């Protein structure tokens, strides 16, 4: 069947009527086409006008779709704007949070009843100061835990006096205020008493194991390896062959501060650098010392921090602070007292021969990160102040300050109105990720505050004294009349706070779960076929079913807390029989009436239970 095409049509002709070319011949359309096979097409427009002008108008290029959308010229193709999904903030205040269900654990091992062993030290280098005429040996801590990746680590010990939570807080030697082994990077080296630190490469920071939350606290730092002192007579030949002695920075830092940088690189630290005595905060250096004066080897730098009472601090972060009613924060902290609900969401685990706690650490907030890297002096979210309504992390503490002394001489107060740190100004990282999304992110574990911090670079070394005997000594009172105390006194206070918090956790666990009836825990139904607790993120999320222990269903509640009298007896005996000086948690809780440690006998296992084994982490 042949196709029929009207005459004058512009469409192609049928393949049947089209001639075929033999192979090897020239293309068909290279010559003149006969009228029979010619294709009809409309006549092209006349080009006479174009040829006479000699020029051709430039074609206008059409804007791209993105440009048209930006100019608002192509409204039809603009996709509809998505509604911003506001994530509901389910975080609860620390005062409204209760203890999490203790994990289902095997019975403590005999070794769990013993305190943690001293850290193993490996010799690295020796620093000698010609100005001071002393030498210091520095060691690397072998196989140490480091606070990172959103988690913080501490040490635990099994105690039969705590049948519900089974373990309580403890620490590793040396038992005094010092630099923390866990709160420092691996590049930091310690002296044997952990009061002196150094680093051989880039900037690294070490934080102490004591923090200031309210009141006036003081510590001293002496440079043992740094900028040479003017009294050191060095010839030209000696100076050319003399190795650099490094640099140091001193100050205070919060737990959110980066330890792989120098103190003051962000909004979470306040420091002073040895070169020219410049003060540093959020990467901004400002002149502070007189011109030509620096911090040199042998100099003693005193750091005094003053913080308002926690009662005023809470009003600032809650947004209820009124200076006309609450004052300006200059009144001594002894005039105002407040109750604090310490929430420590911890997971116990074995690490080699030790038993440790793992808990969420605080993380830096977006507002302060943006402010630290903002080149403008006025941040996008408004200037930091006690009344900043954008975010609690941008609020500052009235009456707070940091004063710096050099060799006993007061140099001035470079930092005032320090950033608030109580939750929700500080937020805990979640167990699943570091976004801090969850109802327990505002929990206060009692160790959120400002820590003494020292940064070292290229071999710089610093020795600190957190309590007497001092090299120089602090003033008797701060500018607001607050009595000045050595921050090392916080060591014993933190032990007492840990002991009280452990007792409160045990009593709360006894009252809430001591008389479990059926499969209902705290008015929340749990699957009767539950296989016990699961660790990690499910427990930190606060799920009742995640930490439910079905073994306690058949155990009478009264039989479980028959040994709770040991708590008060051990506490009383530890306080009366402890030696003068520093206390330890073992002195407070594990010392009997005769002054000897309690025997390492594990508590009696529960009836009708199947012993399980904990998974060791290495």
From Swiss-Prot:
GO MF annotation, one: transcription cis-regulatory region binding
Taxonomy, superkingdom: Eukaryota
Subcellular locations according to the entry: Nucleus; Chromosome, Telomere
Biased composition (Basic residues): 57-69
Domain B30.2/SPRY: 157-368
Keywords: Chromosome, Nucleus, Telomere
Segments of this protein annotated with the region Disordered: 1-91, 588-618
Composition bias, Low complexity: 8-19, 37-49
Coiled-coil portions: none
Record bears the keyword Nucleus: yes
Function: Component of the COMPASS (Set1C) complex that specifically mono-, di- and trimethylates histone H3 to form H3K4me1/2/3, which subsequently plays a role in telomere length maintenance and transcription elongation regulation. Controls the production of several secondary metabolites, including gliotoxin, but does not contribute to pathogenicity.
Family: Belongs to the cclA family.
Protein name per its UniProtKB record: COMPASS component cclA
Native species: Aspergillus fumigatus (strain ATCC MYA-4609 / CBS 101355 / FGSC A1100 / Af293)
Gene label: cclA
């Amino acid at each position: 069947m042949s196709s029929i095409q009207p005459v004058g049509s512009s469409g192609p002709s049928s393949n049947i009527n089209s001639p075929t070319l033999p192979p090897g011949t020239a293309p068909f359309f290279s010559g003149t086409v006969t009228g029979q096979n010619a294709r009809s097409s409309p006549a092209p427009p006349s080009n006479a006008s174009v040829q006479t002008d000699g020029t051709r108008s430039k074609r206008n290029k059409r804007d791209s779709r993105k440009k048209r959308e930006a100019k608002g010229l192509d409204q039809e193709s603009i996709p509809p704007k998505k509604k911003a999904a506001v994530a509901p903030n389910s975080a609860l205040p620390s005062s409204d949070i209760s203890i999490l269900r203790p994990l289902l654990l095997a019975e403590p091992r005999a070794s769990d009843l013993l305190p943690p062993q001293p850290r193993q030290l490996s010799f690295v280098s020796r620093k000698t100061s010609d100005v001071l005429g002393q030498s210091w040996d520095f060691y690397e801590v072998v196989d140490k835990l480091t606070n990172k990746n959103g988690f913080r680590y501490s040490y635990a010990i099994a105690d039969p006096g705590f049948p519900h939570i089974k373990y309580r807080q403890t620490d590793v030697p040396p038992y005094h205020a010092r630099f923390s082994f866990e709160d420092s990077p691996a590049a930091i080296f310690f002296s044997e008493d952990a009061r002196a630190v150094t680093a051989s490469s880039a900037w690294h920071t070490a934080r102490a194991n004591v923090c200031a939350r309210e009141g006036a606290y003081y510590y001293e730092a002496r440079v043992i390896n740094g900028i040479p002192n003017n009294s050191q007579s060095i010839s030209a030949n000696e100076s050319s062959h003399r190795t650099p002695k490094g640099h140091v920075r001193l100050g205070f830092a919060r737990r959110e501060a980066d330890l792989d940088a120098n103190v003051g690189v962000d909004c979470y630290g306040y420091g002073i650098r040895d070169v020219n005595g410049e003060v540093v905060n959020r990467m901004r250096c400002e002149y502070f010392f007189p011109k030509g004066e620096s911090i040199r080897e042998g100099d003693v730098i005193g750091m005094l921090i003053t913080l308002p009472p926690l009662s005023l601090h809470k009003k600032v972060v809650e947004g209820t602070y009124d200076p006309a009613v609450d004052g300006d924060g200059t009144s001594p902290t002894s005039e105002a007292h407040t109750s604090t609900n310490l929430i420590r969401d911890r997971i116990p685990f074995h690490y080699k021969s030790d038993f440790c706690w793992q808990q969420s650490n605080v993380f830096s907030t977006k507002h302060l990160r943006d402010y630290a890297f903002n080149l403008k002096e006025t941040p996008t979210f408004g200037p930091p102040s006690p009344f900043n309504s954008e975010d609690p992390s941008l609020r500052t503490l009235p009456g707070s300050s940091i004063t710096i002394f050099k060799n006993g001489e007061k140099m001035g107060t470079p930092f005032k109105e320090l950033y608030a740190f109580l939750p929700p100004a500080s937020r805990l990282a979640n167990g699943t990720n570091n976004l801090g999304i969850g109802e327990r992110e505002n929990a206060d574990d009692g160790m959120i505050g400002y820590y003494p911090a020292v940064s070292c670079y290229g071999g710089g070394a610093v020795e600190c004294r957190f309590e007497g005997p001092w090299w120089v000594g602090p003033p008797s009172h701060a500018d607001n009349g607050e009595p000045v105390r050595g921050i090392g006194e916080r060591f014993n206070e933190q032990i007492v706070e840990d002991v009280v918090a452990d007792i409160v956790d045990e009593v709360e666990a006894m009252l809430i779960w001591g008389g479990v009836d059926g499969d209902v825990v705290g008015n929340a139904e749990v699957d009767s076929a539950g296989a016990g607790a699961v660790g990690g993120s499910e427990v930190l999320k606060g799920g009742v079913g995640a930490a439910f222990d079905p073994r306690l269903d058949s155990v009478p509640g009264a039989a479980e807390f028959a040994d709770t009298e040991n708590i008060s007896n051990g506490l009383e005996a530890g306080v009366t029989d402890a030696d003068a000086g520093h206390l330890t948690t073992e002195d407070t809780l594990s010392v009997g009436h005769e002054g000897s440690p309690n025997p390492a006998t594990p508590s009696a296992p529960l009836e009708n239970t199947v012993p399980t084994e904990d998974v060791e982490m290495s």
